[in-house]
Curated annotation (Swiss-Prot):
Catalysis: reaction(s): 3 Na(+)(out) + phosphate(out) = 3 Na(+)(in) + phosphate(in)
NCBIfam families reported for this sequence: 2a58, Na_Pi_symport
Gene: SLC34A2
Annotated InterPro entries: Na/Pi_transpt
Swiss-Prot/TrEMBL keywords: Cell membrane, Disulfide bond, Glycoprotein, Ion transport, Membrane, Sodium, Sodium transport, Symport, Transmembrane, Transmembrane helix, Transport
Residue ranges that the UniProt entry lists as topological domain Extracellular: 122-135, 234-362, 429-485, 547-552
Family to which the UniProt record says this protein belongs: Belongs to the SLC34A transporter family.
Annotated membrane topology: Multi-pass membrane protein
Residue intervals on the Cytoplasmic side: 1-100, 157-212, 384-407, 507-525, 574-687
Organism: Pongo abelii (Sumatran orangutan)
Name of protein: Sodium-dependent phosphate transport protein 2B
PANTHER family, sorted: SODIUM-DEPENDENT PHOSPHATE TRANSPORT PROTEIN 2B (PTHR10010:SF23), SOLUTE CARRIER FAMILY 34 SODIUM PHOSPHATE , MEMBER 2-RELATED (PTHR10010)
Amino acid sequence: MAPWPELGDAQPNPDKYLEGAAGQQPTAPDKSKETNKNNTEAPVTKIELLPTYSTATLIDEPTEVDDPWNIPTLQDSGIKWSERDTKGKILCVFQGIGRLILLLGFLYFFVCSLDILSSAFQLVGGKMAGQFFSNSSIMSNPLLGLVIGVLVTVLVQSSSTSTSIVVSMVSSSLLTVRAAIPIIMGANIGTSITNTIVALMQVGDRSEFRRAFAGATVHDFFNWLSVLVLLPVEVATHYLEIITQLIVDSFHSKNGEDAPDLLKVITKPFTKLIVQLDKKIISQIAMNDEKAKNKSLVKIWCKTFTNKTQVNVTVPSTANCTSPSLCWTDGIQTWTMKNVTYKENIAKCQHIFVNFHLPDLAVGTILLILSLLVLCGCLIMIVKILGSVLKGQVATVIKKTINTDFPFPFAWLTGYLAILVGAGMTFIVQSSSVFTSALTPLIGIGVITIERAYPLTLGSNIGTTTTAILAALASPGNALRSSLQIALCHFFFNISGILLWYPIPFTRLPIRMAKGLGNISAKYRWFAVFYLIIFFFLIPLTVFGLSLAGWRVLVGVGVPVVFIIILVLCLRLLQSRCPRVLPKKLQNWNFLPLWMRSLKPWDAVFSKFTGCFQMRCCCCCRVCCRACCLLCGCPKCCRCSKCCEDLEEAHEGQDVPVKAPDTFDNITISREAQGEVPASDSKTECTAL
């Protein structure tokens, strides 16, 4: 319910309205005359109106504004179980089973679409990501390493891929562990873009989008804040490198078995039918293999046979022969026998693009569009199914189970249990992106609060590192130490971040920052896309370019920018906490132009560009909804056209000045209630006022 508008001349005391009102009451003319005659002799009689007709009651007791971050109550408008007959109960059971099957099916395709989305990004930008790593000389700069880790992980949509590239480079002595640590930190930031993209799919409902986007970006802010604090500490002390080196030196482990595939056992059979990639090519490009640059990432041959044979080859002289017995010469040329290894292709892979012979960019673009469409469709259906299931008593039980703390004095343990649950679930699905992306719609519809989602997200950061540690233990001997040390660096980095931003409640800044961004994005929804472009592309690319130009350029540009940001933050803190210490002009931002202190002018600009597209989108939504209504027979399923309702609210909900009602308004309302004044006349009088 929308809050009451502020009244310009509201009087908190109802006596000021009701004094002398009896003189104008038509139902008691005699009493009013006597009251007017004795006005100077006796006190004025006050008439108490019913709360239904009294505007003074509305002024004195305003309705409390609902907190947008409160979990919404999903009312169950269906027929109660006790009121159903036998046929209705059986039908209800089958409907529940059908919804569960549909939910699991859409969740399966949702996870598969995330896997294909990662493959699409690797096809589009995988070779470029490998070229970022190919220049190992620039990797010694920690800031450049951080930015490269962010950009590469955003391009390939997989922190596991970027981490495996780093491991292969470290094991090949192309990169040191010290230079690899900032890249791992950047990969931790880049992997959080996936669930932020998923949150954009709930943009149709402002309330859901506010919660979903805040729940997704709490992961971003945790990673950014952790890097801002821990990267300088690591550069100064190298504590991650030292701790992990001691742990690795204490191990005397041999090569283990491969890391267990849990969720991938279910999803691989389907995703392999869509596309299969040769991910070794990206690592080969990173290690400056020129032949790999001309190879396609799309895997064509799945079954090959490697054979060795002896062939005659020409050598410059007899000194190059393999042995004297295998060396022949005619005085002009010299031959010898050499063992040559060749690969023989036996069977092709079984996927859609195996015989298309399209370039990687074309295949990646096709898969990117299709995977985003499937991702959006699955997410919409998951939200709708959950919204239809999580109602009434079921919703109450689930919300209380997830969001309720342990009884005192063990309430503080609840968050740490949530961290363990998040780590365990991420270990099962073997991807933090999959877990946090599945968490996002639940936050949007109000099943999980932001405060509970935060420790679950922190646990997912821990869970993805345990998977990397198991994978490192299964590495071959030449890569075991380096891969294990890098996986442990990733693990202790996330542990350090949790110690910084979770144990003490007032240090949980990511929650407050995510809520602030959620409020802004709910009001100006274009700002969510702006945030993604700025934080995951423009800022890393700008820092990358300035770093390549030299440290003098980086310092000359970066120091003033950092100084301005710190100054603005300090001013904002003083304005909110103790504004009296500031000059009057600096107690607010009104001294700045409107476009520098408000998003309203920018919103007007973006609205002009997006207005036409939004209207066309709404028309398509209405057509699709009506077709859906015809199929399912439900007259209320057109709620998916909420963008149209938002447009109508935007046009109708303009700021109209509302004045406090005078005594005459009370009289008019009472006359209308008694039937003496027609409703149309009263509306005309109110309009004239």
